[in-house]
A protein has these predicted regions:
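Gram-negative bacterial Sec-dependent N-terminal signal peptides
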Residues: 1-19
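Extracellular/periplasm-exposed beta-strand and loop segments of Gram-negative cell-envelope proteins
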Residues: 33-36, 75-80, 84-93, 121-167, ...
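Outer-membrane beta-barrel pore domains and translocons
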Residues: 66-70, 116-118, 168, 188-190, ...
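N-terminal, post-signal peptide beta-strand-biased segments of exported outer-membrane/organellar beta-barrel
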Residues: 15-126
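Membrane-embedded beta-strand positions in outer-membrane beta-barrel channels/transporters
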Residues: 48, 99, 170, 321-322
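Residue-level signature of outer-membrane beta-barrel architecture
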Residues: 55, 103-106, 171, 175, ...
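Membrane-embedded beta-strand positions of outer-membrane beta-barrel proteins
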Residues: 63-67, 113, 173, 183-185, ...
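Outer-membrane beta-barrel channels and translocator barrels
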Residues: 58, 106-109, 178-180, 329-331
Length: 345
């Protein structure tokens, strides 16, 4: 029997952060809700959006504390044809999305500090799991049927909770060269925390297999594969005396003709291999096939057993930042900021 294609693992994806990349949050100020174009800001939230523009502030200390609470639903639509369902809906909750900004202006100089969730910031709950979890189990019925074990359906209980937040703490200094041009240089420290919790339970299938599930009722997949491994081990052991006696090179038909095996034993040995059996196989090859089946079935029993994942990832990185603010007149202000690549470790 060939292995069923099972791969049950937590999908823990890590990737380098690129400044301005798709993972970077853009709503770093409550003012963003009213005005999406904040990249040339000269208000206190310029600490994040346009730090070189902080020189437009009046002399003295400036401070801002704001928070956003966000709720949404995310739907994943997967077209894999063997899935029972193709839509997976998750509840996304972000109860605490703060922005803390402070700046002190002294003539031409401005020293600033910012703290905010640079990426992520919330949790996602998928009560029915994710398609990447379910796809391996959805392939079991077709895989077993292809091996001569009629199977038409599966079921599985899945759940997944994930959270991700990349906290950014930024410091820097801005300098005003003249009324038109100012510049900024600073550094942001990123502290990343990702958590993943999930369950895979009650993987059930309905194989029709004599001696294990002749009626084709739903049963736990791990129980089916465990019993299949036991039967395969027994079949491999049953022909060992014949091999020890020098009959390993005989086919099953030849062994029957020679009186080493009964017609019933030949039928059981051939039938147990299903589509993997052909009449030219020797007794030794039949034994090897059953041994391989026993190993594969034991692995599949483990892969379809109840599983729980609880993982926490952490990382730290540093982002150099430079900026330029250009004001050719009172009506035009242009903010430029470049964030270097961040390597998380």
């Amino acid at each position: 029997m060939k292995k069923c294609l099972l791969s049950v693992a937590a999908m823990l994806l890590t990737a380098p952060i690129f400044a301005g990349g798709i993972l970077t949050n853009s709503n770093q100020s409550a003012a963003y809700m009213r005005m999406l174009a904040r990249d040339a800001s000269t208000s206190i939230d310029a600490v994040y959006y346009n730090p070189a523009g902080l020189t437009k502030l009046s002399d003295g200390f400036h401070f801002s504390l704001n928070n956003q609470t966000l709720f949404s639903k995310r739907t994943i639509d997967n077209g894999f044809p063997l899935l029972n369902e193709h839509k997976y809906t998750g509840d996304v909750t972000v109860p605490f999305f703060p922005g803390v900004y402070a700046a002190y202006k002294m003539d031409r100089w401005v020293f600033s500090f910012g703290f905010n969730p640079n990426s992520g910031g919330g949790t996602a709950n998928y009560g029915k799991g994710l398609p990447s979890f379910e796809i391996p189990f959805s392939a079991i019925p077709s895989g077993l049927s292809a091996m001569g074990i009629p199977t038409t359906a599966y079921s599985v209980d899945l759940s997944f909770d994930g959270s991700s937040v990349f906290w950014g703490s930024q410091v820097g200094a801005s300098y005003k060269f003249n009324d038109m041009i100012s510049a900024f240089a600073g550094l942001r420290m990123i502290n990343a925390v990702n958590t993943y919790k999930g369950d895979i339970k009650n993987v059930r299938i309905n194989p029709v297999y004599p001696g294990i599930n002749p009626s084709g009722n739903f049963m736990l997949a791990t129980d089916f594969f465990t019993q299949l491994a036991t039967l395969a081990t027994g079949a491999a052991t049953s022909v060992q005396p014949l091999i020890d006696g020098g009959g390993g090179a005989l086919t099953l038909s030849q062994a029957q003709t020679a009186g080493y095996l009964t017609p019933t034993e030949v039928a059981q040995l051939a039938g147990g291999l299903g589509a993997a059996y052909n009449s030219s196989m020797t007794v030794s090859q039949v034994q090897a096939a059953y041994q391989a089946n026993a190993t594969a079935s034991s692995e599949n029993a483990a892969a379809t057993s109840d599983q729980h994942v609880d993982v926490r990832q952490t990382g730290t990185g540093f982002t150099p930042i430079i900026g330029l603010n250009f004001s050719p007149n009172d009506k035009i202000n242009i903010g430029i900021k470049y964030e270097f690549k961040t390597k998380l470790e």
